[in-house]
Amino acid sequence: MKIVRRDFVRNGPGSVKMVAEDSDDLWYAYNLIAVGDSVMAVTFRKVQREIPGGGRDSERVKLKLEVQVEEVDYDKDGSVLRIRGKNILENEHVKIGAFHTLELELKRPFVLRKEMWDSMALDTLKQASDPAASADLAVVLMQEGLAQIFLVGRSVTSSRARIETSIPRKHGPAIAGYESALKKFFENVLQAFVKHVDFSVVRCAVVASPGFTKDQFHRHLLLEAERRQLRPIIENKSRIILVHTNSGYRHSLGEVLHAPNVMNMIKDTKAAKEVKALNDFHNMLSTEPDRACYGPKHVEVANERMAIQTLLITDELFRNSDVKTRKKYVNLVESVKDSGGDAFIFSAMHVSGEQLAQLTGIAALLRFPLPELEDIEM
């Protein structure tokens, strides 16, 4: 996120002018913009005008509007953020109080005003503008006849391509048909790889599968790259990593992120620290269950007893339209940090955030055992 101008008071009012440069930035903006804030941006609106002879005509006019936010919608596939609210900026074409939907797109500046820049909003802003936080990976997740290409960013995991090819059985007289279908499948995956994997953006490309499919495709990829002189692949072949997974389906992305050779490539990033924290939580839950808890009630009680060493929480919980609920979670994060603990805020649109959401979206590693939590209803 490019921050053009900031003018606010911590825990007080103010505004920030910013430009979203990628889909991760739009996700950060989605988490920053809350109901009751105001957003100013250039937009287009169809307006009616009189024409000679008494008729009316309509045209799209470029306007600068500021709306008081009533609803925010994030369209991941279209890379656009839609903000609906009432106009609060005097304009000859749009009355004050009229409803309008602003569409925030990549590379288009906007100004966000808040009455209260709390610690969560400031943390989100800091992460959004930190280039070192990037963890872009390209992942080719495959099994025979199925391949999917994902881009895993700081906060958003997006699907870029899905390739399906019917492959006959390998045995008997069908063997020739098998080999030709497999070659065609690999060729389709190669085309998608060339189109969607940009080594100037991603740290590495992971090819993952059960069995030997990944090795066969990797061999095909490098041979064809040499034959066709595909320079981006030839020059970055050391950044193509192979990982074993149990399937070629999306849920196996978690296995990819936990693989040691992948962790090593992204070890200094926010995403890697979150994956490690989630790993540590699962390990603790299976080895010392009294030192791990999840669910709002259990985590709240653990915090009251100053027992939380590491808090894991999804950003979904901070987007609650009820100000009291948001404040409760903001205070929880601050309380854990004040008592010397760590707090990791997971994106609900990231693989690790999806896994945490299955555990209610909130969990904690404890400094000392709290066996009595078992008796408290979640």
Curated annotation (Swiss-Prot):
Gene name for this UniProt entry? PEL1
Q: Per the UniProt entry, what are the Gene Ontology biological process annotations, in alphabetical order?
A: nuclear-transcribed mRNA catabolic process, no-go decay; nuclear-transcribed mRNA catabolic process, non-stop decay; RNA surveillance
Its cofactor is:
a divalent metal cation
State whether keyword Metal-binding applies: yes
Annotated family? Belongs to the eukaryotic release factor 1 family. Pelota subfamily.
* Keyword terms: Cytoplasm, Metal-binding, Nucleus
Q: Pull one GO CC term from this UniProt entry.
A: nucleus
Can you say what this protein is called?
Protein PELOTA 1
